[in-house]
C-alpha cells in the first residue's frame, strides 16, 4: 500500500520501522523541523527523519501543513493511506480527506480515555493500573475518530513513563500492521467512541514538574514515576532545584510533621513527610549535577532531618 507517514519522536519511529519491515510502500515521511536540543543546543533531526534517511525515504519538514504547496505535494504522492503517529500537529480537512483508505492514527491510550498530547504521562500520574494503544480513523477532532483496534498493557506500581512508553511503542507498531492489513482487505471496523467517557491528557508544562508535598505519598510517587525520564519532577532545597527521579512508599508511620519535612537521611534513602504518609527518595539530581542514587548524593552533600523541602531559603530547622 502507498503510505505517507507522519510522525516525529522515537515512539513514531518504531511504527515507521514496522511498516518498512512489513514491506509497505512508504512513499514519503513528514516530520517536524530539526530543532536544537541538549545542553549544547545543537540542532538535531527528529528520530523519524534519521530512520527515513537510513532507508532513503523522501523527507518533508514543513513549518506549516496548512499551506497549499504542501497539500499539493502530498496529493501528488497519491497515498492510499496516511499514517500519523505522534506527529505533533493537527491535520487540516484537506489532508484528512485526501487518501482513499483514510488517515490512520496510533494513539497511546485506550480511547476515549486520555485524549491529547501526553497520554502515557497522565495515565501514570493519575495512578491508572492499565493503559494501551488504539488505532483509529482520524477526523477533525482531537483523538475523536472511530476506533479500529486496541491493545492493553498493565501498569505496575513502580513502572515509569519510560518503561510504559517502550511497551506501547512496540505494541502500537504491531497494532498498526494489523490495521493496515485490515485496510488492505477493506474490512477495518469503525467503532464509534463514547464521547461521554472521554478524559484528557493535556500538554505538559513547567508547572506540572513541581512536587506538591501537601499531596499523599501515593500521589507524589505516581507523579515522580509519571515524569521519569522526561521531563522529571523537582522540589527546592538550599535555594536550588532538586530533581526527584525515583521514590518508594515505605510502611506508614504516624508522625507529626509538616508536609515536605525530611524525617530521616540514610544510604537507603531520604524519608520525607507528605500530607498522607511518608515517601522515600531513592534517586535524585541537584541543579548543576547529574542524576544519582542517594548513597552517592550523600557522599558530597549533607541533608539533615528537619529540613523542609520546597521552600526557598535555608536548609530548614
UniProtKB/Swiss-Prot annotation:
First-level EC class: transferase
Q: Which UniProt keywords apply?
A: Protein biosynthesis, Transferase
Q: What are the GO cellular component annotations?
A: cytosol
Q: Name one Pfam family in it.
A: Formyl_trans_N
User: What GO annotations for molecular function exist for this entry?
Assistant: methionyl-tRNA formyltransferase activity
Which residues are noted in the entry as (6S)-5,6,7,8-tetrahydrofolate-binding?
109-112
EC number(s) per entry: 2.1.2.9
Q: Which domain of life is it from?
A: Bacteria
Which HAMAP family does the protein's record reference?
Answer: Formyl_trans
Instruction: Please give the function described in this protein's UniProt entry.
Output: Attaches a formyl group to the free amino group of methionyl-tRNA(fMet). The formyl group appears to play a dual role in the initiator identity of N-formylmethionyl-tRNA by promoting its recognition by IF2 and preventing the misappropriation of this tRNA by the elongation apparatus.
What is the name listed in the Swiss-Prot or TrEMBL entry for this protein?
Answer: Methionyl-tRNA formyltransferase
Species assigned in the record: Desulforamulus reducens (strain ATCC BAA-1160 / DSM 100696 / MI-1)
Taxonomic classification, please?
Bacteria, Bacillati, Bacillota, Clostridia, Eubacteriales
Amino acid at each position: 500500500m502507498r503510505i505517507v507517514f507522519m510522525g516525529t519522536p522515537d515512539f513514531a519511529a518504531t511504527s515507521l520501522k514496522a511498516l518498512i519491515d512489513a514491506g509497505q510502500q512508504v512513499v514519503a515521511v513528514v516530520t517536524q523541523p530539526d530543532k536544537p536540543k541538549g545542553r549544547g543546543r545543537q540542532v538535531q533531526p527528529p528520530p523519524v527523519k534519521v530512520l527515513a534517511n537510513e532507508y532513503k525515504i523522501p523527507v518533508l519538514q514543513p513549518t506549516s501543513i496548512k499551506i497549499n504547496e504542501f497539500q499539493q505535494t502530498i496529493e501528488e504522492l497519491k497515498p492510499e493511506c496516511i499514517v500519523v503517529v505522534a506527529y505533533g500537529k493537527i491535520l487540516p480537512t484537506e489532508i484528512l480527506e485526501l487518501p482513499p483508505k483514510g488517515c490512520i492514527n496510533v494513539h497511546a491510550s485506550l480511547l476515549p480515555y486520555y485524549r491529547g498530547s501526553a497520554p502515557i504521562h497522565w495515565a501514570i500520574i493519575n495512578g491508572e493500573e492499565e493503559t494501551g494503544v488504539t488505532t483509529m480513523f482520524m477526523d477533525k477532532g482531537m483523538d475523536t475518530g472511530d476506533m479500529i483496534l486496541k491493545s492493553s498493557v498493565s501498569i505496575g506500581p513502580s513502572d515509569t513513563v519510560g518503561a510504559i512508553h517502550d511497551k506501547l511503542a512496540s505494541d502500537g507498531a504491531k497494532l498498526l500492521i494489523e490495521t493496515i492489513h485490515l485496510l488492505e482487505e477493506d474490512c477495518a471496523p469503525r467503532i464509534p467512541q463514547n464521547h461521554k467517557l472521554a478524559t484528557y491528557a493535556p500538554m505538559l508544562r513547567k508547572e506540572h514538574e513541581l512536587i506538591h508535598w501537601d499531596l499523599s505519598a501515593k500521589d507524589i510517587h505516581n507523579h515522580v514515576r509519571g515524569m521519569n525520564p522526561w521531563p522529571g519532577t523537582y522540589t527546592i532545597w538550599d535555594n536550588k532545584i532538586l530533581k526527584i527521579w525515583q521514590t518508594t512508599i515505605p510502611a506508614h508511620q504516624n508522625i507529626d510533621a509538616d508536609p515536605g519535612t525530611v524525617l530521616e537521611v540514610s544510604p537507603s534513602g531520604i524519608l520525607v513527610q507528605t500530607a498522607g504518609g511518608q515517601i522515600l527518595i531513592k534517586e535524585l539530581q541537584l541543579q548543576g549535577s547529574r542524576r544519582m542514587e542517594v548513597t552517592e548524593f550523600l557522599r558530597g552533600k549533607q541533608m539533615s532531618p528537619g529540613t523542609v523541602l520546597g521552600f526557598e531559603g535555608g536548609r530548614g530547622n
